[in-house]
């Protein structure tokens, strides 16, 4: 029996993104996400806006490709490490990855309530019902293992102070931490609107030019590297293998910025 889900604002965007992954997985196949397909199959929700929003779909798939690659590489280097997925929504990366010791999915109580119904988790996978800006570090049981923190699809809905607060929580909890943070260019924040996101009444509010600019705001972190989502786009739109080499296009695209605890 399918479930009817009602959300609004930023939490509603999680339905759009899991739908994009499910649709890609069952269609063209640039990613494979059977858990997303199962989740969408059990929902009553009008995805007509998401169906028409090609930009949103492409962006979700591109960042999934890049983040899966970076997460998998980190887990190979740190087997048994701890992963914290901040603002997890209905993300299913924990089902696509292996090699972690513990995986925490963190989001607002409203969101976690939905996740618990659709993706009940236990064992190595835990859920934390808190805001990303709350002091959630005390909910992490592991003491000395290296940690990977993923911040996907969130910073563009926050303020600079909010972003700094999240990194302060991370620095206060982990001595050894790598952060994968998705960011949006300020020009895009001001001028670009995704149809399905607008339909959920969520608004883009903050952006940062590049990894160096983000690191300058975070005294406890150093920049390791950054990746344009054009890298992910190139996996399913071949022309991006060329377009991604053009600085203006590479720089205007969302980025996955990799930072390390100092």
Residue ranges: model-predicted function:
Residues 186-202:
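Short, glycine-/aromatic-enriched active-site segment of Class I SAM-dependent methyltransferases
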Residues 201-231:
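Short alpha-helix
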């Amino acid at each position: 029996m399918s479930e009817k889900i009602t959300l609004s604002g930023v939490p509603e965007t999680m339905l759009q993104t899991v739908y994009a992954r499910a649709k890609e997985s069952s269609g063209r196949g640039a990613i494979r996400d059977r858990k997303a397909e199962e989740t969408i199959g059990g929902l009553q929700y009008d995805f007509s806006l998401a169906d028409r929003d090609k930009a949103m779909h492409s962006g979700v798939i591109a960042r999934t490709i890049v983040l899966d690659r970076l997460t998998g590489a980190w887990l190979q280097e740190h087997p048994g490490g701890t992963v914290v997925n901040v603002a997890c929504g209905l993300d299913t990366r924990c089902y696509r990855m292996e090699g972690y010791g513990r995986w925490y999915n963190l989001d607002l109580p409203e969101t976690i309530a939905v996740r618990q119904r659709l993706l009940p988790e236990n064992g190595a996978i835990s859920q934390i019902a808190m805001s990303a800006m709350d002091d959630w570090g005390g909910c992490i049981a592991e003491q000395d293992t290296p940690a990977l923190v993923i911040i996907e699809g969130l910073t563009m809905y926050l303020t600079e102070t909010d972003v700094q607060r999240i990194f302060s929580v991370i620095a206060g909890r982990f001595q050894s931490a790598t952060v994968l943070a998705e960011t949006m260019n300020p020009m895009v924040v001001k001028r670009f609107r995704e149809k399905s996101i607008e339909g959920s009444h969520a608004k883009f509010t903050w952006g940062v030019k590049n990894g160096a600019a983000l690191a300058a705001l975070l005294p406890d972190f150093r920049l390791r590297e950054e990746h344009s989502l054009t890298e992910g786009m190139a996996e399913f739109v071949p022309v991006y293998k060329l377009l991604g080499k053009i600085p203006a296009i590479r720089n205007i695209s969302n980025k996955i910025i990799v930072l390390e605890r100092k």
